[in-house]
Amino acid sequence: MEKQNEEISTDDAETSQSQLVDDSKVETLDDCVSKVETLDDCVSKVETLDDCVSKAETLADCVSKVETLDDCVSKVKTLDDCVSKVENLDDCVPKVETLDDCVPKVETLDDCVSEVETLDDCVSKAQGLKEEGNKLFQKRDYDGAMFKYGEAIKILPKDHVEVSHVRANVASCYMQLEPGEFAKAIHECDLALSVTPDHNKALLKRARCYEALNKLDLALRDVCMVSKLDPKNPMASEIVEKLKRTLESKGLRINNSVIELPPDYVEPVGASPAALWAKLGKVRVKKTKKSNQVEEKSEGEGEDVEPEKKNNVLAEKGKEKIKMKVKGKQSDKRSDTSKEQEKVIIEEELLVIGVEDVNKDVKFVYSDDIRLAELPINCTLFKLREVVHERFPSLRAVHIKYRDQEGDLVTITTDEELRMSEVSSRSQGTMRFYVVEVSPEQDPFFGRLVEMKKLKITADSFKAKVNGRGGCKVEDWMIEFAHLFKIQARIDSDRCLNLQELGMKLNSEAMEEVVTSDAAQGPFDRAAQQFQEVAARSLLNLGYVHMSGARKRLSLLQGVSGESVSEQVKTAYECAKKEHANAKEKYEEAMKIKPECFEVFLALGLQQFEEARLSWYYVLVSHLDLKTWPYADVVQFYQSAESNIKKSMEVLENLETGKESEPSQAGKTDCLTHEKDLGSSTQNNPAKEAGRLKSWIDILLCAVLYERSIMEYKLDQPFWRESLEAAMEKFELAGTCKDDVVEIISEDYVAGNTLRDIRFHMEEIIQIFDEIYEAKHWTNGIPSDQLEEILKRRAENIFHVPNIAIQRG
């Protein structure tokens, strides 16, 4: 029992202890709840963040559902981490606020647009400056033009396409200067090509500069490049042909824009540059040995000299003798110094003598002519030029070239370049110099050589005079002195001012200045009118040729008879129609060129009138059925002829009105009377001449209306009488007597005003006109022979073929 009681008490004690422990645990849980409450406060601070609130609510639910203390504590710790994360969310606000900073960046797009607009403004401004420079260039103000071009280049971007065009214009200015600045022009072309490598104008201008500098190989390279880029460029083709002719005349050949040398002959045996340098080395070794011997000899003689006496030491090398006195009382140091100086002097003299004695063999190649010569080592360019002059006496001014390691022909212009040619030819054997003939202005030594030649001739003659008479005059001495002074001062006294060239230059400049002015527009307009008139009259005359051809076709039918008459008539009709079509085409072209020339309208009306008569009488000759024949085309011919003749009358009246309004320009008449149709005219009375023209046009219009009335009558048209009455009115306007004309045709009328057979009695009409001309001298100025010529055209020879009767009634 006691044991049981003890066990029970022990269990109660354990139970009480466990309850105490549970109570302590519960207290810590309250602390957790208090912590959770503080977390709720934290969540309330970040109420604006929906995600954090949702997380906090979820944590509160977790706390209420916590079954164990460890889970709660772990949750609380996790909540602390969440709070720290929530607190870090405040840092995100400034990042969001930085979006406002993006607005100005977006606004910079407008700045980009403004920059693009600014670029367009710069380009337009540069083009304006370029146009101003072009105007100054046309006025020969090259400095002002280059200034404008320079301003345009400053405005444009460096890699803009317009820069190449402007620099090409600058190169043109340099080329036009006196004398031409071709080197600067080439530099500008290089800058233009650096922006646009395929700029044709820059390549052509650089080629012209190279040609002016006689660098034909470089000029040919640029021009061939232009030909490849633009095969149809006429200027490039012209320059290529010119360069080829120039190079071929000098014995050179062109193979695909590469200059080839002529075939060389077999080289004679001579000293090569390697042997030349070896020879020079032997001379130097020999000189060194001799100098050592001189030194030993001088030392030995120095030892034999007694102190109280003076001895003479002689050192002899080649042709030079060096004497040196050595005093006996001098110290050994001074004696040694003098010996060293003696050795150096002897060595230098021997070196100079050896170099002067050594020459090198060279070849001069001119076209197919190759000649040998000798040159001293390290000679000057002028010396080389003298040798060329001696070897080729017939040549005047030349350039001397050598072939470099790349195979290009390089012109030698300085002594340094001559040294470079010697270095590049060491591996080629005998040195070769290529002689190219140029103009005297391009050879800097030509003037000096000419003066030296004259001086030599003068000196020879002077010596001959001295030897011949034993004395000379002061004048000869003055002439010689003048030649020497001219050579030294480089004064060209023989050059005089060419007044003719200067006058022509000033004249051309003045003409260009006048041409570019506003006052030149009037003469230009008058010149344009004259050229238009010349072109229109040429086409007008060509139309006359076709009309004459059509009439000639018809005149060949006279005397034709037999069965083949109809075929020949048809062939002649078709050929005449073709000639009429060609004449009409030429007249219409003349009308487009010179629409205010009344002669064009008159010629076109006459052509349409003759074509209408040709078609109508061909129908009559062919005996076609007039009821089924389509006559609309012939009627249209008559209407067009009448319209054009009236138009010519209107243009003539307008010309007269213009002459009256501008009496000062009375001589500026665009269209005058054509001599072929009008014959001789009175130049002293323009009003009388105009009256004659109007009368002639009225008669031509009368003939058109009369022929039309005949056709309309045959076709049973009701308005034939109107055409006939209009023709009678025109006869009256032309100055004829209406009663006489009516009397002629009255025999053809019958009762009821029906036309039985209208025939134009040519002989009677001409007789009446002759009587009027004799009585009244044709107050309107139209002679009867002209009227006869016009009226005879009413029926061609095709309508008078034998054995063919034309029935009209």
UniProtKB/Swiss-Prot annotation:
Annotated ranges, domain PB1: 359-438
Induction comment: Up-regulated by abscisic acid treatment, and by cold and salt stress.
CDD domains: PB1 (cd05992)
Pfam families listed in its UniProt record: PB1
Function: Carboxylate clamp type tetratricopeptide repeat protein that may act as a potential Hsp90/Hsp70 co-chaperone. Contributes to polar growth of root hairs.
Gene3D superfamilies from the UniProt entry: Phosphatidylinositol 3-kinase Catalytic Subunit, Chain A, domain 1 (3.10.20.90), Tetratricopeptide repeat domain (1.25.40.10)
Segments annotated as TPR repeats: 126-159, 164-199, 200-233, 235-265, 274-311, 508-541, 563-597, 615-648, 709-741
InterPro entries recorded: PB1-like, PB1_dom, PHOX1-4, TPR-like_helical_dom_sf, TPR_rpt
Originating organism: Arabidopsis thaliana
Name used for this protein in its record: Protein PHOX3
Cystine pairings recorded for this chain: none
Observed phenotype of the null mutant: Phox1, phox3 and phox4 triple mutants and phox1, phox2, phox3 and phox4 quadruple mutants show a 70% reduction in root hair growth.
Residues recorded as bearing Phosphoserine in the entry: S298
PROSITE patterns according to UniProt: PB1, TPR, TPR_REGION
Basic and acidic residues: bias regions: 307-339
Keywords, alphabetical: Phosphoprotein, Repeat, TPR repeat
Region (Disordered): 1-22, 288-339, 656-686
Annotated gene: PHOX3
